[in-house]
Amino acid sequence: MVKAVAVLGSSEGVTGTIFFTQEGNGPTTVTGSLAGLKPGLHGFHVHALGDTTNGCLSTGAHFNPNNNEHGAPEDENRHAGDLGNVNVGDDGTVSFSITDSQIPLTGPNSIIGRAVVVHADSDDLGKGGHELSKTTGNAGGRVACGIIGLQG
């Protein structure tokens, strides 16, 4: 089993830890908890770069090795990094578990060394009709991020 972790933080007070596990060539399970967010849905994505030299802005676009349009996690035509939304409670926290087959921890499309990003707004899953729907899901600014690193 391969394991990875990302510790999220931001200048806006958002914190969290996200764990990634993958058994063999199976899907990757993503579990985590976040705090300090406004209640409601927040876009949640793996971005292409593990560069936080300019905060979350330097993490690049959504991880998209197949050059697809933005979409929902269940869509076949989607960025590999499109993980949908996390639903934050009234207390500003969320715990979640996601299983996804497009974000492996090994191989040529590994997400190790890339960033995971939480956005200010909900991801419209490419279906919102906004000019940004097919690229970012119109999910707004980047409120927290962390680099995905191998875990022992």
UniProtKB/Swiss-Prot annotation:
Its cofactor is Cu cation; Zn(2+). GO terms for molecular function: copper ion binding; superoxide dismutase activity. Its EC number is 1.15.1.1. One of its GO terms (cellular component) is cytoplasm. Residues 62-82 are annotated as: Disordered. One of its GO terms (biological process) is removal of superoxide radicals. Disulfide bonds join 56-145. Binds 1 copper ion per subunit. PROSITE patterns: SOD_CU_ZN_1 (PS00087), SOD_CU_ZN_2 (PS00332). Keywords: Antioxidant, Copper, Cytoplasm, Disulfide bond, Metal-binding, Oxidoreductase, Zinc. It catalyses: 2 superoxide + 2 H(+) = H2O2 + O2. Residues 71-81 have a biased composition (Basic and acidic residues). Signal peptide: none annotated. Belongs to the Cu-Zn superoxide dismutase family. Homodimer. This is Superoxide dismutase [Cu-Zn]. It comes from Glycine max.
